[in-house]
Regions:
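Conserved PLP-binding catalytic core of the aspartate aminotransferase-like
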Residues: 251, 261-293, 311
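PLP-dependent aminotransferase class I/II
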Residues: 185-269
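Short, conserved charged micro-motifs
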Residues: 35, 122, 282-289, 316-320
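Conserved PLP-anchoring active-site segment centered on the Schiff-base-forming lysine
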Residues: 85-108, 113-116, 120
Length: 328
């Protein structure tokens, strides 16, 4: 199972229409930001530079981007993940693993040697680039600022770059390494769709030293995002009250999910407030039994005792999961 959030495989194997499924396979807020009413011209005209500037201004405030650090928008962080290896000077990359697989895949596709390392490992000699997902997906591991600074200083001596994927950092802004970009060779990727529950909008950001952000902006071109994405993103990122309330709501929902999973015999192995990673010696059988009841969670080809569950959207969905688990 390569990624969560796509019911195509589930329906092909187990049938059922999309509405019949409870999709818990992705770490995306199931209660999204309420879409604002958009004027018709947002859909009809090309996005203006003023529209883009307004979005980036909102993002700078939301992500606490300091002066002297730049920011660029793109159609989701996946676009940025694909571009970074092509914009980087020659050199090999270390990926703190296991983690989101598209980072290593993008660098390998660009012809780079990719080395998987553990969070506790020293960076190998000969490495010019390091990729860290923080908080990590799927285990939620957090690397503190001291560790990130140590790695970035090591890489600075090699004229390289540390790329920090903060797709889940909205859950706790104190985790973010954005402030470190002012003095260290770091590019931070921020995902809009996960925390705001609007993954289909395709919006993400790169934050870092001006030289790198200019390189990214030039590669992406003059219209990096659609007009609707600019408008919705600006509204959501400016809504600080919604973000604060959502953090509290997600924490409460995650604890409720913990209770259900623990009662079914799963041991927590990690996660964030948007997903839980759990361990069970019969995890693959559990995955199959749930799928037969049209409940889809995330399994992993590299670990047959792990499953990841996203948050159920409401009490009825949580109860549905609890009933299905109790029958196993």
């Amino acid at each position: 199972m390569k990624h969560g959030g796509d019911l195509s495989e589930a329906m092909a194997q187990y049938g059922g229409a999309p509405d019949a499924w409870l999709d818990l396979s992705a770490g995306i807020n199931p209660n999204p930001y309420p879409l604002p009413t958009l004027p018709d011209n947002v859909w009809q005209r090309l996005p203006s530079r003023a529209d883009q500037a307004a979005l980036l201004s909102a993002a700078r405030r939301a992500y606490a981007v300091p002066d002297g650090v730049d920011i660029a928008a793109a159609t989701g962080t996946q676009t940025l993940i694909q571009w970074l290896p092509r914009l980087a000077a020659p050199g090999n990359v270390a990926v703190v693993s296991p983690t989101y697989s598209e980072h290593a895949a993008a660098w390998q596709l660009a012809g780079r040697e990719v080395i998987a390392i553990c969070a506790r490992d020293e960076i190998p000699q000969g490495i010019r680039y390091v990729i860290i997902v923080n908080p990590n997906n799927p285990d939620g591991r957090i690397m503190d600022h001291a560790a990130l600074t140590r790695i970035a200083k090591f890489i600075a001596e090699r004229n390289g770059l540390v790329m920090i994927d903060e797709a889940f950092a909205d859950l706790d802004p104190a985790i973010s390494a954005v402030a470190l970009c002012k003095t260290l060779p770091i590019v931070v990727l921020r995902s809009f769709g996960k925390f705001y529950g609007l993954a289909g909008l395709r919006l993400g950001f790169a934050v870092g030293v001006p030289e790198w952000i200019a390189r990214i902006s030039e590669a992406i071109g003059p219209w990096p995002c659609s007009g609707p994405a600019l408008a919705v993103g600006r509204a959501a990122l400016n809504d600080i009250a919604w973000a604060n309330q959502t953090r509290a709501n997600l924490q409460r929902q995650a604890l409720q999910l913990d209770t259900v999973l623990r009662a079914a015999g799963f041991a927590r192995a990690g996660g964030t407030a948007l997903f839980r990673l759990v361990r069970h010696r019969h995890a693959l059988a559990c995955h199959t039994i749930l799928a037969q009841q049209h409940i889809w969670c995330r399994r992993f080809d590299w670990a047959d005792d792990l499953l990841r569950f996203g948050l159920p959207p409401n009490e009825a969905a949580l109860n549905r999961l609890a009933r299905a688990l109790s029958e196993m």
